[in-house]
């Protein structure tokens, strides 16, 4: 499965770009907000969500782990697939979504093309607890780690990623805290690499 692509934007279209990676072109679908930040001929790093079906493989790209996380979160709602999730993220940022759900503001979602009253109600109802957990977890992590350059939701994703790579939760949180204390503006990618490097050097 493809988790990340680093390459040059060869061409762009209404809902996807072709990313050239060492001469191989990958079609990557993305939200309008992400596509607006990608310029042809420039190189970018995209976090990838790979969807495999019997007749095709689709790649969905994101400039942040936070957007990728909400892409998957939205699809947990009955009636929302990849296309609708991207449509919502084309209009609303992850922070917008969190605020709307916390405020039970269905009208924010109803204003999006393809989202009717019933779907807007399901989004608020089905994601209420999940977003509340993200918000409380992110706030706790932000307070304990004093994060400056990385958003709270993204930091939570980093810790989850490290746990999936074999860290205990305690090890992951301590590793992130130590690294960010030394370099508050470190990128997410570099943060993960440094944590893995430090852990391997201790064995």
From Swiss-Prot:
Signal sequence extent: none
Main location: cytoplasm
Stretches the record annotates as Domain II: 64-142
Chain spans, region Domain III: 150-203
Annotated region described as Domain I, given as residue ranges: 1-63
Gene3D superfamilies attached to this UniProt entry: 5' to 3' exonuclease, C-terminal subdomain, DNA helicase RuvA subunit, C-terminal domain, Nucleic acid-binding proteins
Keyword field contains Magnesium: no
Location of the protein in the cell: Cytoplasm
Keyword terms, alphabetized: Cytoplasm, DNA damage, DNA recombination, DNA repair, DNA-binding
Gene Ontology MF annotations: ATP binding; four-way junction DNA binding; four-way junction helicase activity
GO process terms (BP): DNA recombination; DNA repair
Cellular-component GO terms for this entry: cytoplasm; Holliday junction helicase complex; Holliday junction resolvase complex
Region (Flexible linker): 143-149
Superkingdom per UniProt: Bacteria
Protein family membership: Belongs to the RuvA family.
Purpose of the protein: The RuvA-RuvB-RuvC complex processes Holliday junction (HJ) DNA during genetic recombination and DNA repair, while the RuvA-RuvB complex plays an important role in the rescue of blocked DNA replication forks via replication fork reversal (RFR). RuvA specifically binds to HJ cruciform DNA, conferring on it an open structure. The RuvB hexamer acts as an ATP-dependent pump, pulling dsDNA into and through the RuvAB complex. HJ branch migration allows RuvC to scan DNA until it finds its consensus sequence, where it cleaves and resolves the cruciform DNA.
Summary of subunit composition and partner proteins: Homotetramer. Forms an RuvA(8)-RuvB(12)-Holliday junction (HJ) complex. HJ DNA is sandwiched between 2 RuvA tetramers; dsDNA enters through RuvA and exits via RuvB. An RuvB hexamer assembles on each DNA strand where it exits the tetramer. Each RuvB hexamer is contacted by two RuvA subunits (via domain III) on 2 adjacent RuvB subunits; this complex drives branch migration. In the full resolvosome a probable DNA-RuvA(4)-RuvB(12)-RuvC(2) complex forms which resolves the HJ.
Comment, domains: Has three domains with a flexible linker between the domains II and III and assumes an 'L' shape. Domain III is highly mobile and contacts RuvB.
Protein name, per record: Holliday junction branch migration complex subunit RuvA
Gene coding for it: ruvA
